[in-house]
Amino acid sequence: MPAATVDHSQRICEVWACNLDEEMKKIRQVIRKYNYVAMDTEFPGVVARPIGEFRSNADYQYQLLRCNVDLLKIIQLGLTFMNEQGEYPPGTSTWQFNFKFNLTEDMYAQDSIELLTTSGIQFKKHEEEGIETQYFAELLMTSGVVLCEGVKWLSFHSGYDFGYLIKILTNSNLPEEELDFFEILRLFFPVIYDVKYLMKSCKNLKGGLQEVAEQLELERIGPQHQAGSDSLLTGMAFFKMREMFFEDHIDDAKYCGHLYGLGSGSSYVQNGTGNAYEEEASKQS
């Protein structure tokens, strides 16, 4: 089977509080053979800017991420499981976790909520039937999906995505220093390939996830701007790029563990502060 072939029998499983335990049991089995985990989140935008002096633009970008992740709540998490060849498990390949979120009580950016509502996010259901993040974290910690060097995470411009996951897993605010953030990141997610970071070595590939998918001639399954569909498309893009641009081998020393827009992946931002989130927010447009 060629890498990242689309099989329309793929199902995206919706996970709410009522079926969380049952679906996490399935994931504990799936991860044994399908150890490539493509991930995406949906979150309520950006509501704050850090103030003060910053050592560098890279430092500013991390502080921008930190203050927003600390203030806001995750809305959705999508996880798609694939094997070394880019093949999916039979039946369900993608789980979309829907978290508790209350438009009356929780902070958000209005434009982000409008986009997510248009994309089919059911905020009333999130309020009434959403998953509690702390309980989800307990299940994820023992799932074999995190804290495992054999699991390879695939993402797209994913500083904020991993920021929210680290906040959930540690049940605390993000560390003040970016170096400490990357230390925690390596603990929970020892192997990460950020597709947007890989694109730096791919001639002519540019833009957000949807634009990249179109350039790679990939067909989306499910609605854009929902975490399940976006995680599935991220996984497809990784395997298609690996085949087309990397001769089916990614140099870990060069690419593993780098997040586009943060740390060593932040050199692309040279024209002032504040633009990394804007690109992040429109990454699937």
Swiss-Prot record:
One of its GO terms (cellular component) is CCR4-NOT complex. It is an enzyme of class 3 (hydrolase). Its cofactor is Mn(2+); Mg(2+); Co(2+). The keyword Transport does not apply. A divalent metal cation 2 binds at residues 40, 42, 230. It catalyses: Exonucleolytic cleavage of poly(A) to 5'-AMP. Binds 2 divalent metal cations per subunit with RNAase activity being higher in presence of Mn(2+) than of Mg(2+) or Co(2+). GO terms for biological process: deadenylation-dependent decapping of nuclear-transcribed mRNA; defense response to virus; miRNA-mediated gene silencing by mRNA destabilization; negative regulation of cell population proliferation; negative regulation of type I interferon-mediated signaling pathway; nuclear-transcribed mRNA poly(A) tail shortening; P-body assembly; piRNA-mediated gene silencing by mRNA destabilization. SUPFAM superfamilies: Ribonuclease H-like. A divalent metal cation 1 binds at residues 40, 161, 278. Component of the CCR4-NOT complex; distinct complexes seem to exist that differ in the participation of probably mutually exclusive catalytic subunits; the complex contains two deadenylase subunits, CNOT6 or CNOT6L, and CNOT7 or CNOT8. In the complex, interacts directly with CNOT1. Interacts with AGO2. Interacts with TOB1; recruited by TOB1 to a ternary complex with CPEB3 which is required for mRNA deadenylation and decay. Interacts with BTG1. Interacts with BTG2. Interacts with NANOS2. Belongs to the CAF1 family. This is CCR4-NOT transcription complex subunit 7. It comes from Mus musculus (Mouse). The lineage of its organism: Eukaryota, Metazoa, Chordata, Craniata, Vertebrata. The gene is Cnot7.
